[in-house]
Each structure stands twice: as C-alpha cells, then as structure tokens.
UniProtKB/Swiss-Prot annotation:
GO terms for biological process: UMP salvage; uracil salvage. Allosterically activated by GTP. GTP binds at residues 30-34. It comes from Pyrobaculum aerophilum (strain ATCC 51768 / DSM 7523 / JCM 9630 / CIP 104966 / NBRC 100827 / IM2). 5-phospho-alpha-D-ribose 1-diphosphate binds at residues 79, 104, 133-141, 203. This is Uracil phosphoribosyltransferase. GO terms for molecular function: GTP binding; magnesium ion binding; uracil phosphoribosyltransferase activity. Uracil binds at residues 197, 202-204. The keyword Iron does not apply. Belongs to the UPRTase family.
C-alpha cells in the first residue's frame, strides 16, 4: 500500500494512549502534539541535504544543512488537527501555515463535507505542502482540503499526514492525486455506519477539546 507507516516505537506508544478510551482530553491533546513532532522529524528525513563546514568555538566541523525547510507550508483541518500541527510546527518552525475549516454533513446516509472557511498561503512550484488531519477516514474531507490547496497553487510535493488512515481514504486521495505522499501511524481496516474509523480512537476533535 502506498503509505508510509510511522513505526517509531514512541509513536506507536503514543497511538496506544490515544486509542485508550480512558485517556483524558489533556493527555490526548498532548499526545497529538508529540505525535506531530515525531511525524515532522520523519518527514525531515525525506528532504535533500548538503554538507557544510562550520566554525565551532574550538575549531572547524562538518555538519548537515537540510534544504527546503523554508519552503514548507502546513495546512491544518480545523479543529482536530490543531494539536497535531502544533507538533509539526516544532519540527518545521519556518513553515507558513494555512487553515481550512470543514464540517461533515450527513443526509440520507450519505456523508459529505462543507468547507466554510479557507485561508491557504500562495503556493509555489517548489513548495512542500503538508496537509494534516488526525483521521483519514473516507478521504472526503481530505480531498476537499487538497482542492483548496491547489486553488492556491501547484506544490512540488503534497504530503498528507494522519494519525490513523483507512484503505478507503488512502485510495480516494491517491486516485485523484497519485503523486501525493501519505504518512500515518496506523491503517485501520473499516468504518462504521457513521463513517468513523474502527477501531480508531473515536472523535479526535471532541476528545482533544473535551466537547
């Protein structure tokens, strides 16, 4: 499956805590922040690097510079992605930030998504756009958000970041944007009749903000 699983042991530990129904909102929110940072570090491994010579207080040393950190744009899906993006920004402090507010709508058993606010920075061809949403379930919300990204320009790389994804969500995104890169901490098999991921972790936004 064309998705990169973040199998770092601490990421999997945090996911276990997030899945636990007994984890309170404060710890849940903190867990999303920590996961965002870990995922950010994993993404940084995919950036090109160059070796540079620097002066320490005591002599010369050879180090590494990561190319393109100033080209990162992080787009968050309100509100569930806020803690996750807080962690991503710790890994990419130079990133420009975009926000898309989406609301699920269900009519006659059909789930759709309405976008009621969108503010995405202008996108250049050498930008790396990271779209973050904790749950990639049906892929409908993510698809709507990616459409907003492309209205702002065509990025050099499009990266989708989720805590938990499903085969359906992955397929929906890649069928429209085959060059998209998807990162998740886990892929769960199914959705229930409310389009929530099973076993998943529940409603990420409600659990993070105690609503």
């Amino acid at each position: 499956m064309p998705v990169r699983i973040i199998d770092h042991v601490y990421a999997q530990y945090l996911l276990t805590k997030l899945r636990d129904k007994n984890t309170g909102s404060i710890e849940f929110r903190k867990g999303l922040v920590r996961l965002g940072r870990i995922i950010g570090y994993e993404l940084a491994k995919t950036f090109p690097v160059k070796y540079v010579e620097i002066e320490t207080p005591l002599g010369k040393a050879v180090g590494v510079d990561i190319i393109g950190l100033d080209k990162v744009v992080i787009v968050q899906v309100l509100r569930a992605a806020m803690p996750l993006v807080e962690g991503l920004v710790k890994a990419f402090p130079q990133a420009r930030l975009g926000v898309v507010a989406a609301k699920r709508r269900e009519e006659g058993g059909v789930v759709d998504v309405d976008i009621f606010y969108s503010k995405v920075p202008k996108i250049a061809e050498d930008d790396v756009v990271i779209v973050a949403d904790p749950m990639l379930a049906t892929g409908i919300t993510m698809s709507r958000v990616i459409e907003e990204v492309y209205r702002a320009g065509n990025p050099g790389r499009l990266i989708v970041v989720s805590v938990i994804a499903t085969p359906m969500g992955i397929e929906r995104v890649l069928s429209r944007w085959p060059s998209a890169e998807i990162y998740a901490v886990a892929v769960d098999p199914t959705l229930n009749d409310k389009a929530f991921i099973v076993p998943g972790l529940g409603d990420a936004g409600d659990r993070a903000f105690a609503t």
